[in-house]
UniProtKB/Swiss-Prot annotation:
Name of this chain's protein: L-seryl-tRNA(Sec) selenium transferase
EC number in record: 2.9.1.1
Underlying gene: selA
Catalytic activity reported: L-seryl-tRNA(Sec) + selenophosphate + H(+) = L-selenocysteinyl-tRNA(Sec) + phosphate
GO cellular component, one term: cytoplasm
Keyword Aminoacyl-tRNA synthetase listed: no
Length: 463
């Protein structure tokens, strides 16, 4: 060992001496003596390795307390961190989909802090059913006879098929054999549910006669799947639920629909593209309709099934129902969200998903122009900061071909180097509340459709 190496080793402090320093008192109070000591041992090992490999000390050896604080602060951050979603996708699956209404947040908080009547009947002090209160709300909104709640729509489809068609055939159009994110495929779900898929028609054209010819003594269901994340256009033909229900009645085969995104209001009244609604399918005579709670409905992740009482009863009594049931927090948030639909006049104000989807391009444009000047002054040496029109998307497989006019702040490096864009995006991801945009066409785009806390946004980006 050289004299220089020996000198470097001698500069490493003893853990006991570090812990006696006043700067470590608050760290021990905050993170605990055990964790602070563990980290100091780890850092000493790192320092010894650096001396051995490169004959130098880490820069943080100048201030051990500061480095320990930085590491433990980062370690203590939640894995689920709030972010500012400026990607242009309102219902971003990777960012948690629908924001919850204040009423839903309050309901969840109350449910977490206290015992609740989850499965307890106050009238007779007996055991109640956890879906009962929500079933009544859903029946009121959709016109269904009964309802069932599980933890997401994939679970809803699995339960619906397993409870009503296991060991039998389910007839589906080839054009509706969807795959959604995470390789969730209708044929795979049917196989897991114990059903046999009977494909009919072609990718682009399916007629009533195709369903009729497919029905046999082993047919359990005629199924429609809403193609919420793609669209087949051009030379196409499909039959709607009303026509399929009429055929099902003639052949004595019930019809079920996986609606996917599941809007409970006519979006066209807000200037948005219309999406099929569960209440329309119930009115058409569909026996079971499944849809998501955290997409266009604007609530928590949940799978909702509405339909005929005798069919729902089969779902409720199936063993999978217990495995897939929703917990009290989900039910509390969903109930509070559904109650907002009882007052449609205030829905676009109180439901964040609808509020964000209905923001006008003009309002977003004005916001972008207001933010452009201070950001250009701060970033102008490296980037051209401009206001540009853009198109937002709804996301989560909802209305896949429809776009919403919006406005964005774009950052274009003066030297045209893409690495500068990546570096800027990485810096913003390290902010106390990370700002998430998207890089496209040589620019970093911040679509402002979902920006509501403008002051917090500016404060962070101007530091």
């Amino acid at each position: 060992m050289t004299t220089e190496t020996r000198s470097l080793y001698s500069q490493l402090p003893a853990i006991d001496r570090l812990l006696r320093d006043s700067s470590f008192l608050s760290l021990r109070d905050t993170y605990g003596h055990t964790r602070v000591v563990e980290l100091l041992r780890q850092m000493l090992d790192e320092a010894r390795e650096m001396i051995r490999d490169s004959q130098t000390l880490p820069a943080w050896c100048e201030n051990w307390a500061q480095e320990v604080d930085a590491r433990l602060t980062k370690e203590a951050q939640s894995a689920l961190r709030p972010v500012i979603n400026l990607t242009g996708t309102v219902l971003h699956t990777n960012l948690g989909r629908a924001l919850q209404a204040e009423a839903a947040v309050e309901a969840v908080t109350k449910a977490m802090r206290s015992p609740v009547t989850l499965e307890y009947d106050l009238d007779d002090a007996g055991r109640g059913h956890r879906d009962r209160a929500l079933a009544q709300l859903l029946c009121r909104i959709t016109g269904a006879e009964d309802a069932c709640i599980v933890n997401n729509n994939a679970a809803a489809v699995l339960l619906m098929l397993a409870a009503t068609a296991s060991g039998k055939e389910v007839v589906v159009s080839r054009g509706e054999l969807v795959e959604i994110g995470g390789a969730f495929r209708i044929p795979d779900v049917m196989r897991q549910a114990g059903c046999t898929l009977h494909e009919v028609g072609t990718t682009n054209r399916t007629h009533a006669k195709d369903y009729r010819q497919a029905v046999n003594e082993n047919t359990a269901l005629l199924m429609k799947v809403h193609t919420s994340n793609y669209s087949i256009q051009g030379f196409t033909k499909a039959i709607d639920e009303a026509e399929l229900v009429a055929l099902g009645k003639e052949l004595d085969v019930p019809v079920v629909t996986d609606l996917g995104s599941g809007s409970l209001v006519d979006l066209s009244q807000y200037g948005l593209p219309k999406e099929p609604m569960p209440q329309e399918l119930i009115a058409a005579g569909v026996s079971l309709v499944s849809f998501s709670g955290d997409k266009l409905l604007g609530g928590p992740q949940a799978g909702i099934i509405v339909g005929k009482k005798e069919m729902i009863a089969r779902l409720q009594s199936h063993p999978l129902k217990r495995a897939l049931r929703a917990d009290k927090m989900t039910l509390a948030a969903l109930e509070a969200t559904l109650r907002l639909y009882l007052h449609p006049e205030a829905l676009s104000e109180k439901l964040p998903t609808l509020r964000l989807l209905t923001r006008s391009a003009e309002v977003i444009q004005i916001q972008a122009q207001r933010l452009q000047a201070p950001l250009a002054a701060h970033y102008g040496a490296e980037f051209a900061v401009q206001v540009m029109p853009c198109l937002s998307q709804i996301g989560s497989g909802s209305l896949p071909v429809d776009r919403l006019p919006s406005a964005a702040l774009t950052f274009t490096p003066h030297d045209g180097r893409g690495s500068h864009l990546e570096s800027l995006a990485a810096r913003w991801r390290e902010l106390p509340v990370p700002v998430i945009g998207r890089i496209y066409d040589g620019r970093l785009w911040l679509d402002l459709r979902c920006l509501e806390d403008e002051q917090r946004f500016l404060e962070m980006l101007l530091k």
